[in-house]
Structures are given as C-alpha cells and as structure tokens.
Amino acid sequence: MAPLGLKAVVGEKILSGVIRSVKKDGEWKVLIMDHPSMRILSSCCKMSDILAEGITIVEDINKRREPIPSLEAIYLLSPTEKSVQALIADFQGTPTFTYKAAHIFFTDTCPEPLFSELGRSRLAKAVKTLKEIHLAFLPYEAQVFSLDAPHSTYNLYCPFRAGERGRQLDALAQQIATLCATLQEYPSIRYRKGPEDTAQLAHAVLAKLNAFKADTPSLGEGPEKTRSQLLIMDRAADPVSPLLHELTFQAMAYDLLDIEQDTYRYETTGLSESREKAVLLDEDDDLWVELRHMHIADVSKKVTELLKTFCESKRLTTDKANIKDLSHILKKMPQYQKELNKYSTHLHLADDCMKHFKGSVEKLCSVEQDLAMGSDAEGEKIKDAMKLIVPVLLDASVPPYDKIRVLLLYILLRNGVSEENLAKLIQHANVQSYSSLIRNLEQLGGTVTNSAGSGTSSRLERRERMEPTYQLSRWSPVIKDVMEDVVEDRLDRKLWPFVSDPAPVPSSQAAVSARFGHWHKNKAGVEARAGPRLIVYIVGGVAMSEMRAAYEVTRATEGKWEVLIGSSHILTPTRFLDDLKTLDQKLEGVALP
C-alpha cells in the first residue's frame, strides 16, 4: 500500500529533496544516517525505494564502517555534537578519506558552534552539498506525527528540571515549526487559555514560523490556506482519555497486549509445530488501516466477512472463517499465503484482545465510563461514585495500574478529594507504593487533593452526542469537540485565543540558513494540499483515542478539512502512568532538550 498523507509528504521530501537532488546517472552513492534520522526515514520509506534511487548501502554513522573511497556519501543527520563529530572523523584519514565526497543534509538548523567546527575541519574540502531540510518530526501515521521526544514531559513538569522548561519548549516549538513548513502551512496559532506552557509554546512556534516565512515567502499561500490553524492543548485539558480502557481495535491492542515498536508477536499453530510470528502494525497493511478504529465487537465480524468474500472470489469453500479453518485453506492454496496471513494476523489480534477483555477488563470498563461521563449508561447522574469504585479497589485480582486508573478517574470526577480520603482510598486499593504517582497528576495541572474535601468539577463544557454508541464506549475525547468547533468556526475565542501576530520579520534575517553559499531550496514534488488543515499539538503525549478523533473529524468534513494530531510521543495508558511516576523523581540519564 502506498504511503498516505503525512508519510507520503515526508517520504517524497527525503527522496526528492535529499537523494534525487544529488543523484547522477550511473553513479552509486552511500547513505549514512544517525538514529533520529534513521527513525524518520524508516517511518515513511521502504529500503527498496532507497536502493532504487542509486544508493548501494545504508549505514549507521555511529557504527564501524568499511571505507569506500571510490564512492560519494549522502549524510542525513540530526545536527548534534555526536553526529557532527562522527561526520568530521570520516574525513580525517590519510592518505584517503572514508568516502570520495560528502553531500550533507541536516534534519534541522545546525547550531553555529558545530557549523564553525565543520568549516575548520578537513571535511570542508570534501563537501559538495550542505543543506538543512527542516524535518524534525516522525510521520507516525497518515494524520499523526510524533516529535520523538518522550523525555520532554519530564523536562516540562518535573520540579527538578524547572531550569530546562524554557529550552524544552523552544526545542518543541522548532520541531512543530518544521512540521508546518514541511506541509507548506503558515497557520493561525491558538492555544488553551490558562496554563503557561500552551501560551509560551504558541508564541515560540510563531517566532520560528516567521523565520521560515522570511526564508520562503510563499509558505502558507493559497486561497484556502489562510483558514489553516495550529491548536495547542495541554494534557490537563483532558487527563481522562489516556486513562480509559478503550475498546477500539488499535487503542485496545496497544493497551492490553505487549506491542513493542508497533510489532505484534503471536504463536501460530502450523501443520506440525507452533512458532512465533512478528507482524508490524502499520499503514502498509490496508486491512489494519480499515480495522484500527473499529470497535472490537465489529472487528472479528468484519475480518470474517472480508475473508469469506476473499475465499469466494478465489472459489475456495469455507463454512466458518476462523483461525483453525485458515490453516486448512492455506494447505490447499499456498499461493494466497500473503493475503491469508493478513486475515490470520487480525483474527489472532482480535482474539487476543477479547481474551484479555473477558478476564478482568470487562468489569472495569463500565465503572470507568460512568466515572468519565459522570453519568451511567441510562444518562442518570452518578450520585455515589464511591460505591462504584470500592469493589474494584478491594479486588486483589485487579492489577495495581488498573486500580490507579479507576482511582484517578474518581479523583478527576470529584475535582480532588480531601487528604484524609485520598489516604484511605490508597490504603483500600493497597497501592501505597504508588501514592506519589497518583499525586503527580497535580504536576500536569490536575487537582488531586482539595482542602475543602471535594470540589465541583471544572471540566470544559462537553458536546451533547446523539449518535448511537456501545455502552462501554460512551466517552469521546475532549479534543474531538474542539476539532469539530474549529472546522465549524465556533471555537470560543476567549478560551482558545489566537496568538497576536507580530510584525513580519525583516528580510535581512532570511539568509540565516544560507551560510555555506550553495544552499538549495527544497522543491519536493509532492502536490500541496489546497484545502485548510487543522494541526493539533498536545503537550505531554497523545492518546490513541485522540488520534482516532482526527480521522473521524476529517471524514465528517468530507475532505474539506484535513485534521492532523501529534505530540512529543504516543501514549498508552501504561506509558501515561509511567510518565506520571517520574515527575517527583531526580533521574539521571533523561535527555536534556
């Protein structure tokens, strides 16, 4: 399946703006990357695409490499001290350098001291190209981006890192600006009024975008483009969404199963012995794209239907399209192994999710939904939330993190509880060793303890939703309401103010990136989108239910708007609680901005 949306834009920018820009017929080149640039490349390009463009080998700059002095090298690197030193080292050897010449592409602006060091080194003689391509983010999905900076939550919210806050916000702003520039957007910027972070980040992004606009005056031009918006929200505006057990396929699988680096592992029972299979859950799999936002109750039904249709189209007979049946079909028709394996993977995945759900999760879901909504499935207001949660807290079979999720939802519903009540709840749940994790929600801006006992909830006003939903999936993320209000032009300007636009940057500053004289403008051949975009950035991580909302709102506008969403990193409930756990700890080894 060809890359979609954001992945296609970034893939094309790398192929056209980097590799093809220095390609010569009949000449092979070496491609050298560091870890961050390798993550960007592998998120949107296949190795076969790269090799088809005259690249003979792809190498890691931090690993030992055999010199190939007969070939020129393309370096795609993040502008860090470590990568720049490794680059300089490639051109220090005698009598020959590691490579014949260097075409250097930095993913972002190279700091002046490193730039000067490059100029003073022997490398300067071998440089044929030097560009900054401003691509400091990962296209995670067609409409989802990640800044690949999970450490930023700690740097922003841990009191021990208070001195790093400004630098961290500045680094995130630069990355967000490269996303807008890559999409050829110069959006109006809005933020949630209240928290300092959102306002500070919004102003910093505008300053960075103005520098890009000075360099590329056509940025954001087009009749519909003036309506594009960048919206910055903090995690405290919706701490509920990352806590809930979601029952849509992608969110449920990532919450309940052990999916590492988007890879699902499972045992297959073959003809003779069972073996482990590892499958990447990404947009190359069109079946995954079709199923990922469906409710689990519909997934198995849909896979079975699709499998039946496939079998009928190939004149295969099957009564019950299930996992066992699939292995028999495979025996008969090995030529369809690729397609049948895909169905098998998703049947396994759905089956796996349901096994976990039928264990302890099912009984938690209705409690969580009632607490999140503040009302039960019939719409009756919850009068005694304590009665709901005590059975869960006292149940020894419920894992600590699941108890904490329920506990935090209760605290959020009550807008904080008294110190005395909190201590009792923690004791009932037997989660004393996690008490600081629970209290750390305050570092994000949530209310955990309330001296008056219990406050009234200070939540954003929610939309009344009339569409039918499953009883255990009544909650919809706050950001979905906000997205809908933006595309309908009804978002409250007092609660979500625009950043006032300072005077345009004088053109004398525009040459900041043209330091090496042979700078080339990036003219990647991706067709720019004509309609407006809404780009949402959530400070502190984005939940998978929020990712789903971006696709749902885009679909509801029938393509008039494209909604993109992202953050420093993608959250699962476990990841969210792990992040909270660190916010009162003095940790060594967390990356500085």
Curated annotation (Swiss-Prot):
Gene Ontology CC annotations of this record: apical plasma membrane; azurophil granule; cytolytic granule; cytosol; phagocytic vesicle; plasma membrane; specific granule; tertiary granule
Tissue: Expressed in testis, intestine, kidney, rat adipose tissue and 3T3-L1 cells.
Domain of life: Eukaryota
UniProt keyword terms in alphabetical order: Exocytosis, Protein transport, Transport
A Gene Ontology molecular function term of the record: syntaxin-3 binding
GO annotation, biological process: cellular response to type II interferon; exocytosis; leukocyte mediated cytotoxicity; neutrophil degranulation; protein transport
Family: Belongs to the STXBP/unc-18/SEC1 family.
Subunit structure: Interacts with STX1A, STX2 and STX3. Interacts with STX11.
Entry function: Involved in intracellular vesicle trafficking and vesicle fusion with membranes. Contributes to the granule exocytosis machinery through interaction with soluble N-ethylmaleimide-sensitive factor attachment protein receptor (SNARE) proteins that regulate membrane fusion. Regulates cytotoxic granule exocytosis in natural killer (NK) cells.
Name of the molecule in the record: Syntaxin-binding protein 2
Species this chain originates from: Mus musculus (Mouse)
Gene behind the chain: Stxbp2
